[in-house]
């Protein structure tokens, strides 16, 4: 599980002001599926990532809303995921993936972890990358 704290943004995710605990949760299942649940939202995302080779990852996003008819805010959020978040996220995934083949890789790569396993730490991502590296050895 990965978690962090969400902040409202006019450009992306708008956090409901009534939410008192803005904690974001991400759950992943080996080898390539992640479920993300933003705080106080009426949607979740499911992300599938398929490493093709050392430089390429195929990525597929699904966004599930609780309502059938999308609001304008929801349509705007979908566009933000498509045009901003996904390209940034995919670039990060592929840069870590390339780092796994470098001679300087020492089990952590370009991922931030801390001993306290705090909410800003990326232990889940580091563990996932470790599993990918083991699988491809």
How should these model regions be labeled?
Residues 1-137:
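C-terminal catalytic domain of Rieske-type non-heme iron oxygenases
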């Amino acid at each position: 599980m990965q978690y962090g704290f969400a902040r409202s943004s006019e450009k992306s995710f708008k956090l409901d002001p009534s939410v008192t605990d803005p904690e974001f949760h991400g759950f992943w299942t080996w080898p390539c599926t992640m479920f993300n649940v933003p705080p106080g939202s009426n949607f979740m995302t499911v992300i599938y990532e398929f490493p093709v080779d050392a430089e390429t990852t195929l990525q597929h996003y699904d966004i599930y809303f609780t309502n059938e008819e999308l609001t304008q805010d929801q349509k705007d959020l979908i566009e933000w995921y498509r045009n901003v978040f996904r390209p940034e996220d995919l670039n990060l995934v592929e840069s870590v993936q390339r780092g796994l083949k470098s001679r300087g890789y020492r089990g952590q790569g370009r991922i931030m972890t801390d001993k306290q396993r705090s909410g800003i730490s990326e232990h889940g991502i580091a563990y996932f990358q470790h599993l990918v590296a083991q699988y491809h050895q």
